[in-house]
Amino acid sequence: MIRYCRTTLMVCAAMLAANTFAHGDESAQIRFTTDVVPVLTKLGCNSGGCHGKATGQNGFKLSLLGFEPEFDYQAIVKESRGRRILPGAPEHSLVLVKATNEKPHGGGQRTSIGSEEYEIMRRWIGGGMVAPAADDPVVERITVSPHEKVMENR
């Protein structure tokens, strides 16, 4: 009987862990600098051809490739009287409806509803749009490996 209870408990724990891993931890706080900025970069929003160029695009400017997270946070959350985000209904936020092309977007569709990028943005908005913090991790070094060339020229 004890063995059965222990086995059942282990199976339940494994299923719970697998479910958390597969669906992400919804309670985990999304950080602007380490979670949101990489999404903006991956989708090309802060590239030189889009909102990252010197003049921005259609009244919305981001720092080039996310090098100034505090500037980007202000642009998304505070500029234009906060019209780009709707904390009470994140899925209706302008940054999401433009990125999914639900509302016409000059850059076209950059992501789709339910994608990992979409969910990160939605959870960040719904979670209170936590600002960049002084203790956010920063890149200190990049190492390329291997150090030597491994392919020969022909």
Ranges and model annotations:
Residues 1-10:
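Bacterial N-terminal signal peptides that target proteins for export
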